[in-house]
Amino acid sequence: MYQKIKEYFEVHKQEMLDDIMAVIRIPSVNGPEKPGMPFGEENAKVLAFAASLAKELGLKAEVLENKVAVIDLNEQSAELDILAHLDVVPAGDGWTVTEPFVPVIRDGRLYGRGSSDDKGPAIAALYAMKAVKDLGITLTKNARLILGADEETACRDTEYYYSKFAEAPCSFSPDAEYPLINIEKGGLYTKYSAQWKEETALPRLISLSGGTAGNVVPNRAEAVVEGLSGEIIRDICRKTENETGIHFTVEPVLPGVSANQGERWFIRATGTSTHASTPWEGNNAVTGLIKAAASLPLSDSAGFRTLNGLAEIFPHNDYYGVAAGVAQKDEISGVLTLGTNMVDYQVTGLMGKIDSRAPLCASKENMLDVLRARLDAEGIQMDPESRMTPPHHVPEDKPFVQTLLSCYEQVMGE
């Protein structure tokens, strides 16, 4: 049977790749809610595409309230839920091989937003179900593929689904790493803010912003400074660049205006984007720019003091919450990560987002409460509705985990 399955996918490989590329072309970033489209027009479109494709492949499929697409292998009761998603994080910039929604295959790799997270694996799971059906493999229970469209934002897709349907006895998600991950860290995904009265004494920071999504380490950030000479700003930025690896450019907003007349300078910071779960693989342009701005000789103000407090809580390249006082780890689930990947500072206040992946040992008391108090001390308020997401752990010796590992070993030979 294994040989038949292998031959089947050799025959259908190009067909599957074509369908993966077709779904990548849909820019399914969570958008403004529209009537009947809770996650935006493009996310509704991608669910409709997936359901239509599933039907073409001979499977039963339906879209539920434009929140999830549900695809069944047969009419039996569901024994297995396969959880995948078709929404993606914002495209960002700095793409080199291709544009984010123009998929290409180069040197044996498929490039495009969602190719690995999670459109490629979702379509692969769909073709696995088609293979079972086409090869006449008889199953006494149903496998159900549940395709969400809000995983990257708030997981309202699966929340909706499981408010309507019972969980299957077993489930897995093709949205991780091989051979298998049996632990999902808990987390804290929340907002913070601070307000103050505008102060006009020069020099001052007019604005600082960056980031496209809370769960993406930003590669771009920008700021406007008023009342300092370009020479001073460039000197600080050069020092910060040497310390952080963040690249800075400094340009006048209005050339020809002197510092004592309120000359304004535009600062751009460029880093490297990555997923927030592995922040060390990127270089956070937002925290790099905050570090530079906090080092400038600006006039004392409530806003500048708050920015310095933020720089102390989230210092550049502190991936583990050491400065915030929440660093911790355990042998099973690893180390806590903490970062701020979206910040918007203006003359009367700031707001930002926090992304933390918390190990099994983390709790409200030793993580959320500590971070809230740390922010409060700097005049920054965490969203009062903040809650920690609990971790999920299935012990390695469970039969379902062992079955999945055995399948991987048989197919991959490792």
Residue ranges and their predicted role:
Residues 79-147, 153, 168-169:
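Active-site metal-coordination/substrate-binding segment of hydrolases
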Residues 8, 80, 343-348, 388-390, ...:
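Zn-dependent metallopeptidase/amidohydrolase metal-coordination segment
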